[in-house]
A protein has these predicted regions:
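General beta-strand structural signal in soluble alpha/beta enzymes
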Residues: 52, 113-115, 134, 166-168, ...
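Catalytic nucleophile loop
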Residues: 133-136, 159-178
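C-terminal and late-domain segments of enzyme folds
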Residues: 34-76, 84, 93-98, 131, ...
Length: 284
């Protein structure tokens, strides 16, 4: 006997109707795996080099010492950085670009923002990029724009080919498998929580340090999330903290950082992180 009820029909119509209001690029992306596909598996590559920070990466008008050291390690000899500022509201992207250009110039990097190009020209900039920096702001706006423009897959392809990825706050969120533990509001709709997926975890930026007034509440929220999503692992990363995937290993370059899985929560020391590295090396 068929289980396709009137309620099922109405739900299908509602979802399809919502999808019909989305731009063509979004609808095309959604149609590949159904209307709202599940999050992807970790997109692994031995060449992937991915750095994330929890936010608040500057002090006194410069990158913090920890972030500067991490940039030097991560970018190496690559001195041209393509900024991806889609998490910023469109009318503020020029100003954000100028701030970041000055910050990077202090450390002898050249930076330019992808938002000056659209369509195929933007995809060409991604294809020729030496390195990426994906800035913070509105995570849902960032993910929607990446999907709508076709840039999500293009950036993922370059990162898996060895182009360094560096994300801060919202830029950290989209490096993970899904945007499941964002701190910001869903200011726009997205067709799926699935993101770039070059880190094998869900990211929670701006994670409070132990003893901070909001630490216990953040821990409670993440554990509640994991009770509903028990297969996932969450990396909480604090302001000014840095984590890095390189050559198949994940290290905490600067804390605080926290590992969550199931009911377990562990404060991670700096250095190699076996718990997270095991996720990189685990069979698909």
């Amino acid at each position: 006997m068929s289980t396709y009820t009137r309620r099922t029909f109405l739900q299908t119509v509602a979802v399809a109707g919502a999808a019909a209001t989305l731009p063509p690029r979004l609808r095309a992306e959604m149609s590949k795996d159904g209307l709202f596909p599940a999050g992807p598996n970790f997109h692994a590559s031995a060449r992937a080099s991915v750095m994330i920070s929890g936010g608040t990466i500057t002090k006194d008008g410069k990158f913090t010492d920890a972030v500067r050291a991490a940039h030097s390690l991560h970018y190496g000899a690559r001195k041209k950085i393509l900024l991806v500022l889609h998490a910023t509201e469109p009318d503020k992207r020029d100003a954000d670009e100028q701030k970041l250009k000055l910050l990077f110039a202090d450390d002898q990097y050249e930076a330019e923002s992808l938002h000056h190009w659209t369509g195929d020209e933007a995809l060409k900039k991604i294809a020729g990029a030496e390195a990426f920096f994906v800035g913070g702001g509105e995570t849902f706006l960032l993910l929607r724009t990446l999907i709508e423009t076709g840039q999500l897959g293009a950036i993922r392809e370059r990162v898996l080919a060895g182009v360094p990825y560096n994300g801060s706050s919202a830029g950290s969120n989209v490096a993970g498998t899904v945007i499941g533990c964002t701190n910001d509001f869903p200011v726009v709709d997205v067709p799926t929580r699935a993101s770039i997926g070059v880190l094998p975890v869900v990211i929670n930026p701006h994670h409070p340090p132990v003893g901070a007034p909001d630490y216990a509440e953040r821990e409670r929220k993440i554990k509640a999330y994991l009770r509903l999503n028990p297969a996932e692992t969450v990396l909480g990363i604090g302001n000014g903290a840095v984590a890095r995937l390189h050559e198949g290993k994940i290290t905490i370059e600067h804390g605080p950082a926290f590992y969550y899985h199931g009911a377990e929560q562990t404060a991670l020391p700096e250095g190699l992180c076996p718990e997270l590295t095991a996720l990189v090396t685990a069979p698909a």
